[in-house]
Amino acid sequence: MKTVQFCFLFCCWKAICCNSCELTNITIAIENEECHFCISINTTWCAGYCYTRDLVFKDPATPNIQTTCTFKELVYETVRVPGCAHHADSLYTYPVATQCHCGKCDSDSTDCTTQGLGPDYCSFSEMKE
């Protein structure tokens, strides 16, 4: 019985104290409306788990702020989209996370939805490698 209690307490400690929010490599689809196709690029973003809770009885006077794994610092990189027409602006700037933390989701710069389109979504039918 003591082993079960120890395992339970250890798992609770691990979940609370050891958030695994860290940098990870992802592939995103970038698209340019003037070029009418998408290309895939590799970048770095934040992923992992953060301690959070969802109360059964919600108090309207107390805001329920959920933490999420999000960037603490980021830089922007620019890539030239190949194959665009000469008159088109073929430069695309995208964010690259350099440091992560568990914090409130900032909807001004991040898709804070529960289930978004995903980083590899392309609104055009053509995807170039």
Swiss-Prot record:
SMART domains: GHB (SM00068)
Entries under InterPro entries matching the protein: Cystine-knot_cytokine (IPR029034), Glyco_hormone_CN (IPR006208), Gonadotropin_bsu (IPR001545), Gonadotropin_bsu_CS (IPR018245)
Domain of life per record: Eukaryota
Keyword Acyltransferase annotated: no
GO molecular function, one term: follicle-stimulating hormone activity
GO cellular component labels: cytoplasm; extracellular space; follicle-stimulating hormone complex
Family per similarity comment: Belongs to the glycoprotein hormones subunit beta family.
Protein name, as recorded: Follitropin subunit beta
Organism: Saimiri boliviensis boliviensis (Bolivian squirrel monkey)
Gene encoding the protein: FSHB
